[in-house]
Amino acid sequence: METATILGISIAAALVGITVLALYTAFGPPAAELSDPFEDHED
């Protein structure tokens, strides 16, 4: 394979990995530990 192909696949895989990690953190089990600043703020 050419270097550009390997580099492109590596960058695409990294972006997919970051996206999956962000979705897991936002909607998966770790989301229970996140606080909602709008619920914490009292008027």
UniProtKB/Swiss-Prot annotation:
InterPro entries: PSII_PsbN. It is a single-pass membrane protein. GO terms for cellular component: plasma membrane-derived thylakoid membrane. The keyword Phosphoprotein does not apply. Keywords: Membrane, Thylakoid, Transmembrane, Transmembrane helix. It comes from the Bacteria. May play a role in photosystem I and II biogenesis. Belongs to the PsbN family. This is Protein PsbN 2. It comes from Microcystis aeruginosa (strain NIES-843 / IAM M-2473). The lineage of its organism: Bacteria, Bacillati, Cyanobacteriota, Cyanophyceae, Oscillatoriophycideae.
